[in-house]
Amino acid sequence: MAFWQPSQRLYLPPTPVTKVLCSEQYIRRKDVFYHGETERMLTVGHPYYEIKQSGSGKTIPKVSPNQYRVFRILLPDPNQFALPDKAMYDPSKERLVWAVVGVQVSRGQPLGGSVSGHSYQNTLIDAENVSKKVNAQGTDDRKQGGMDVKQQQILLLGCTPAIGEYWTTARPCVTDRPETGSCPPIELKNKPIEDGDMMDIGFGAANFKELNATKSDLPLDIAKDICLYPDYLKMTEEAAGNSMFFFARKEQVYVRHIWSRGGTDKEMPPEAYFLKPKGGDQTQKMPSILFGVPSGSLVSTDGQLFNRPYWLFRAQGMNNGICWLNQLFVTVGDNTRGTTLTITVPTSGSPLTEYDTSKFNVFQRHVEEYKLAFVFQLCSVTLSPETVSHLQGLMPSILEHWDINMQPPTSSILEDTYRYLESPATKCADNVTPMGPEDPYAGLKFWEVNLKERLSLDLDQFPLGRRFLAQQGLGCSTRKRVAPVPKVTEKRIVRKRRKGN
């Protein structure tokens, strides 16, 4: 049978995709589990901005309920660990690594809404209530505004920092030549989420250092900051799967008010969209820029993501919970405990009999309370050529941490080697300090938690450990049944007397 085919079309096979091995293909899990937990971790600061005291030179940090808390968990090197069984692995052919199988992030303090605002907010009119007509703007129409911000709970777990996304100004093309005062182009950028970075609270994920020129468009806690939103799309598509083993989130928001911005609107609606007023000025005076005031609404214990365990059986990426470089990153965002403490102090030491506002100093503080607990499983990696080659392409710092060097290429340059370097007749040796392993996150800010001396094999002595044992069908203690002792019955021997005796 003959078929007709167009001769001008040629379909090539698709380009093969570079395959990344799942960690379970070269990881051997041991039946050894360790429990590690932190102490109660507390932080206190101002909820909106950092304060530098002029007299003492000390700084009151910014501790906002709308900030991320990123914990960098430092684990001991299992290859230098005192293991219960020395025959567990062969150091010449294997390396030991940690795998996280359970995590619980516990939070203290009562629930409370997160309140923010600005004393001079760029709010022209209340656009949802049309009871009053405003014909013109003044020089300064700013007002005091407050709100309960978007409600968020975020929990991210990985062995590298989580990645956030935000919008910021971009460089215009050379041929555009934008005018002064025109709207700049914007672009989407990424950065690692650090401890203290701001979450999106209902006004978008953007660099407000560049986009908020009035310093009045946003609440005080984000007016000069970058609001980040976790880039779930990028972390999900990451080949290695290191930045996000799993995540849990809850977002809740509704528009409580609709206000308009003050300023000169350079992008007015076209004339075809409205009829001009009869008589008077034919130009539209009021701007058409509206924005919604967010509200996080009810805060309750029904939808809490914290104070409960999470068990990792299968990660969303190719890394199934392996803690490369003996570290773990826990990214937490939670503003459901956003209560701000108001502290009033009298200005004088004499007792007061009448209320006078001028005789009191008012301060604000926000407090946070955390406690982390983990269950780790001991694993081994066989140093086969395939595994070493895969790890070299995936994360070369792993092999450097294990003191495994790849064979360097043969140099074609003739180098000089001097003898008697300490002799006055020979040139001075190069003062080169041997470089140690560099910290790839040296310039980033994290809340470091050292668990190198806080691991224990006694899982039944800790709440998370007992829950893990219950998941495995084991209890905190086992009682051996006593086998019943069989009763020994003595047989009575009855002798018959012979007749005649």
UniProtKB/Swiss-Prot annotation:
GO cellular component: host cell nucleus; T=7 icosahedral viral capsid
An annotated GO BP: virion attachment to host cell
Gene3D superfamilies per UniProt: Major capsid L1 (late) superfamily, Papillomavirus (2.60.175.20)
InterPro entries named in the record: Capsid_L1_Papillomavir (IPR002210), Capsid_L1_sf_Papillomavir (IPR036973), dsDNA_vir_gr_I_capsid (IPR011222)
Molecular function in Gene Ontology: structural molecule activity
Membrane-spanning segments: none
Compartments it resides in: Virion; Host nucleus
Keyword Transcription appears in the UniProt entry: no
Family annotation (SUPFAM superfamilies): Group I dsDNA viruses
Key words, A-Z: Capsid protein, Disulfide bond, Host nucleus, Host-virus interaction, Late protein, T=7 icosahedral capsid protein, Viral attachment to host cell, Viral penetration into host cytoplasm, Virion, Virus endocytosis by host, Virus entry into host cell
Record text on subunit structure and interactions: Self-assembles into homopentamers. The capsid has an icosahedral symmetry and consists of 72 capsomers, with each capsomer being a pentamer of L1. Interacts with the minor capsid protein L2; this interaction is necessary for viral genome encapsidation. Interacts with protein E2; this interaction enhances E2-dependent replication and transcription activation.
Function, in words: Forms an icosahedral capsid with a T=7 symmetry and a 50 nm diameter. The capsid is composed of 72 pentamers linked to each other by disulfide bonds and associated with L2 proteins. Binds to heparan sulfate proteoglycans on cell surface of basal layer keratinocytes to provide initial virion attachment. This binding mediates a conformational change in the virus capsid that facilitates efficient infection. The virion enters the host cell via endocytosis. During virus trafficking, L1 protein dissociates from the viral DNA and the genomic DNA is released to the host nucleus.
HAMAP family per the UniProt record, alphabetical: PPV_L1 (MF_04002)
Family per similarity comment: Belongs to the papillomaviridae L1 protein family.
Name of this chain's protein: Major capsid protein L1
Organism, scientific name: European elk papillomavirus (EEPV)
Species lineage: Viruses, Monodnaviria, Shotokuvirae, Cossaviricota, Papovaviricetes
